[in-house]
């Protein structure tokens, strides 16, 4: 934005790649493999509340509404292979 005129100088917005923690990536991979939260909790020796908190954070960081959208977006960004 030009300070004097208030006009936008560039119309292109560059989106930064979302940053997931190692644990969030691990959980997203397990979700992609079809594991439920309670199964992920057991497998990783976490409480289900911790797993669900990670799931919530993943959705927020990727700005999506559900796990399928999160998986697709993470694959598109190269976060998951």
Feature annotation, model-predicted:
Residues 1, 33, 64, 76-77:
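Charged, alpha-helical scaffolding/interaction elements associated with membrane systems
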Residues 1-5, 9, 43:
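C-terminal output helix
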Residues 6-30:
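Regulatory hinge/linker segments at domain boundaries
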Residues 25-32, 59, 71:
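Hydrophobic residues on short alpha-helical segments
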Residues 36-69:
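Recognition helix of helix-turn-helix DNA-binding domains
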Residues 73-81:
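Intrinsically disordered, low-complexity basic tails/linkers immediately adjacent to helix-turn-helix/homeobox/MYB/SANT
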């Amino acid at each position: 934005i030009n300070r004097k005129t208030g006009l936008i100088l560039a119309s292109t917005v560059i989106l930064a790649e979302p940053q997931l923690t190692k644990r969030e990536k691990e959980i997203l991979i397990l979700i992609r493999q079809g594991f439920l939260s309670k199964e992920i909790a057991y497998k990783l020796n976490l409480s289900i509340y911790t797993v669900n908190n990670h799931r919530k954070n993943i959705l927020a960081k990727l700005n999506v509404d559900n796990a399928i959208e999160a998986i697709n977006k993470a694959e598109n960004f190269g976060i998951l292979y």
